[in-house]
Amino acid sequence: AGGINTILRSILDKDDEVVLIAPFFGEYVFYVEHQTGVSKIATCDENWLPDIASLEETIGPRTRAVIINSPNNPTGVIYPKESIAAVAAAIQRAEEKHGTEIYLISDEPYRKLIYTDAPYPFIFEHHPRSIVATSHSKDLGLAGERIGYVAVNPNDPGKADLLDALNFSL
């Protein structure tokens, strides 16, 4: 919660939009509203993976971020590399169309709680403006604690300004 709020505080201006892919952790809507943003909802497909056509329809000129959550809460689905790549490609097409910069934010509190051989893709390989937020409240059994971190893609051309904003917003 703290990491996502810090990220949104750093990148959103009033009425900027954040795209959430349903189903999603319900608190995201409140995090966006708390930072004076607007949540826009894209859908998933029948396999609980992001529906790219819905995502492309939902991203607009005021979109500043797309939040993904994998393994997903509440479905438990792990987004495969192909889905992450497709989401990133849709974001990049929207950036070109609207002349904007859009962050791909990956909320990963369940990343270390995968009990299959499914590989876990790393988003930094797919989009330069990507940010990872995670918490140790799940993997270390620290329910209610707010201990985690935010990682910024080292290939983000605006990483210095973003890191300054993240530090300032704490």
Q: Which ranges hold each PLM region?
A:
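Conserved core of the PLP fold type I
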Residues: 1-96, 111-126, 131
